[in-house]
Each structure stands twice: as structure tokens, then as C-alpha cells.
């Protein structure tokens, strides 16, 4: 596929399983979940911060295996960064964010925080149980239900003389704002509760503790009730079954794929926005929230104008109005020289200019010709 061409959307494969890590996605949007679980490539770049978080997560897992020490941390850090940057370099959507040290302002801070966490591992496995010969850690352990429809890999299972602790590492924001102040994201709590359920399924005992470890080294306890874990598992499997039945009913009519979407302002973080008919319909009918600084536009190609080298200006017709997209670099947007009059065009992650008469672009902005 030529870079920058968006082909007609297809009905996703029917999902037959769910991971605790993706339960939140299933709750939020069935279409997004189905695309993710089928490994459909995203059409927008991942944030470089997410890429850095992936690196830190891998290092945490290596540390839980005892493969990282303070002495070899720097070399392993460089190796893991290179692995992630190599993946980014192979993607036309993300290669412009390499190297991460330049695209992530907190790169060095996160590196130091990760090193500090590694340095504390010999002292304790969690904030109540000192690490000793009676404790053992099973890193990256795969757990599954009896029917294999619910399964996933937990970051660490810590066995102590008092019982088992289920641990998950989170490198991004773990709290969300509420009327009561900051609270742990419900999707993270549900994820750990489902792992507790799977642990009971496999080993016939419940863990004594569920905990999340953040990139700052904070350990967050998650209290739970066994019945809540069981109910959550049943509800998640029921939602999976319902989604599978919906997708199956659409196989002969792909245009009905819009029924799978659950569009809203949270779509701003979705990599599948360009292809999603439900999101496009929502965006055209609803104003952006106050304070939004990224916008998605759909229109028809009207022409190109020269700007200061090497940039050019793209003109789009949108609902009868002529809109200018400034500062487009043909090297970053290779589809520009393939556009012809009245082609359908989508611009994603554009920034509005100060005079609000045109739009600007940066490394996150993506331009598509829609076929």
C-alpha cells in the first residue's frame, strides 16, 4: 500500500478471546477492540511517550527475571531503546520521532526513574514483604481460563510465606480526575481483578494482594472481592460473545460496520480514527471540546500553493469553504504529489492557526488520500 492512501474499511475478523489488558477497550468501543485484537495496523502514529513506556515496561520485566543490575542497566537501556527506535524507523508514520531522546522531553527523567526502581529491587519485592529466600517471582506468567476465552500475561507473580501477590507494571498515567480527587483508573483495577480470577482458575487459590507499580516506583494496592472478580469475568465474556455475534451478522454487509463503533471525544486517542465511519459521523455532528488543540478534517482536494521552501500549502474544500493547511513538507507527506482535483482527503492531528483562518501541521499530523 502506498504511504498515505486510506483504503475502504473492512469488517474485522470475529474475536474469540479477550485479554484482561484489553477489557477496557472492549468496554469503550467494540470496533476498536476488534481491530486491535486482530492486529490491524494503526493509521496514526503512537505517541513517542507510549514508545518510551513500552521500553520501560520491558526493562521492568527483565528486572523481575534478575537480568538487570545497576552495572548493566545503561547497556540494556540503550539496547531496548534501539529496538523500539528500529520499529519506529520502519514506519512512515513514526520514523520522524526517532531518536526518542529528542521527541520525548522527559526521556532522561524517565531513564533516571527506571534506574532508581532497578536499584531498589534487591531491597524488597513490595512495600510490605522484604525480598528474602522464602519469596519467589514468576515474571511474565501466562494465565488462562478453563475455556481459554479469557487469557493474558501478567507481569509478575510473587509468592511469599503469606500468599501470592499479583503485580502489574504501568508506565503511563494511572490516576484519573474525579469529584473525589485523583482515583485509580477503573480499567486498571478491572485488569488486575481479572488476573486474580485467572490465577484462581489455574491454581485453585486467590492471591492475597493485587498491586500496580508505577514508573515512579509507587506501589498501589488494589483491594478486591472474590465475587466481584467472578462477576467481572462473566460480564467480560458475555460482552465478547455479543461483539462476536454482531460482527458475524455484518459479514455480508460491511457498510453496517458503523454499528460497532462507540464514538465520542475519547476517540482523540484512537489510532483507527481515519478509517472509522462512526467517528467521522460523530465528528461532523459534534463540536470539539473547549481547549482542544488537535483537529481532524475531511474535504476535497482543491490544489497546492508554494510556501517557503521546502513547505507547501494544501487547499481543501470543506462544506463549501476553502480551507488552507499550512507548512506541509512533501518528504513527510508523500501522498501530496498523488492528489488530483476533487480527491477525498483526510487530515488528522492538525493544529488551528492563531487567526483561526487556517490549519498548521507538525510531526503528529497525518495526511491521507481516501479511496
Cite the ranges covered by each PLM segment.
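Structural detector for short beta-strands of small beta-barrel domains
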Residues: 287-315, 347
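Beta-strand/loop nucleic-acid-binding surfaces
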Residues: 317-343
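A non-catalytic, helix-rich entry segment at domain boundaries
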Residues: 59-139
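Short, acidic/hydrophobic/Gly-rich beta-strand patch recurrent on exposed beta strands
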Residues: 166-168, 311-319
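Nuclease catalytic cores
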Residues: 20-70, 272
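Metal-dependent nuclease catalytic regions and adjoining charged, substrate-binding loops involved
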Residues: 197-287, 359-371
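Mg2+/Mn2+-dependent nuclease catalytic core
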Residues: 133-233
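Flexible glycine-rich surface loops and low-complexity tracts that mediate binding to linear polymers
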Residues: 299-300, 335-366
Amino acid at each position: 500500500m502506498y504511504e498515505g492512501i486510506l483504503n475502504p474499511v473492512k469488517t474485522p475478523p470475529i474475536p474469540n478471546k479477550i485479554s484482561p489488558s484489553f477489557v477496557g477497550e472492549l468496554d469503550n468501543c467494540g470496533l476498536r477492540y476488534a481491530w486491535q485484537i486482530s492486529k490491524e495496523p494503526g493509521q496514526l502514529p503512537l505517541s513517542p511517550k507510549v514508545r518510551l513506556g513500552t521500553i520501560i515496561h520491558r526493562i521492568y520485566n527483565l528486572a523481575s527475571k534478575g537480568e538487570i543490575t545497576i552495572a548493566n542497566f545503561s547497556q540494556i537501556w540503550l539496547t531496548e531503546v534501539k529496538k523500539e527506535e528500529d520499529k519506529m524507523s520502519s514506519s512512515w508514520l513514526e520514523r520522524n520521532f526517532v531518536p526518542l531522546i529528542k521527541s520525548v522531553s522527559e526521556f532522561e527523567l524517565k531513564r533516571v526513574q527506571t534506574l532508581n526502581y532497578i536499584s531498589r529491587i534487591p531491597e524488597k519485592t513490595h512495600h510490605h514483604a522484604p525480598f528474602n529466600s522464602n519469596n519467589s517471582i514468576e515474571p511474565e506468567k501466562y494465565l488462562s481460563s478453563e475455556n481459554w476465552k479469557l487469557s493474558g500475561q501478567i507481569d509478575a507473580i510473587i509468592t511469599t510465606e503469606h500468599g501470592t501477590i499479583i503485580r502489574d507494571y504501568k508506565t503511563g498515567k494511572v490516576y484519573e480526575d474525579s469529584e473525589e480527587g485523583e482515583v485509580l483508573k477503573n480499567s486498571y483495577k478491572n485488569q488486575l481483578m481479572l488476573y486474580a480470577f485467572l490465577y484462581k482458575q489455574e491454581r485453585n487459590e486467590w492471591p492475597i494482594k493485587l498491586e500496580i507499580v508505577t514508573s515512579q516506583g509507587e506501589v498501589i494496592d488494589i483491594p478486591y472481592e472474590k465475587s466481584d472478580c467472578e462477576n467481572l469475568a462473566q460480564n467480560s465474556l458475555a460482552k465478547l460473545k455479543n461483539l462476536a455475534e454482531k460482527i458475524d451478522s455484518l459479514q455480508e454487509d460491511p457498510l453496517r460496520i458503523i454499528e460497532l463503533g462507540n464514538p465520542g471525544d475519547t476517540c482523540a486517542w484512537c489510532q483507527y480514527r481515519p478509517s472509522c465511519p462512526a467517528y467521522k459521523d460523530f465528528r461532523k455532528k459534534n463540536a470539539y471540546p473547549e481547549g482542544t488543540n488537535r483537529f481532524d478534517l475531511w474535504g476535497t482536494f482543491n490544489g497546492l500553493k508554494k510556501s517557503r521552501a521546502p513547505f507547501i500549502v494544501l487547499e481543501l474544500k470543506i462544506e463549501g469553504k476553502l480551507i488552507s493547511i499550512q507548512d506541509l513538507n512533501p518528504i513527510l507527506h508523500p501522498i501530496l504529489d498523488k492528489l488530483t482535483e476533487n480527491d477525498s482527503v483526510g487530515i488528522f492531528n492538525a493544529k488551528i492557526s492563531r487567526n483561526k483562518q487556517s490549519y498548521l501541521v507538525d510531526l503528529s499530523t497525518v495526511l491521507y488520500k481516501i479511496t
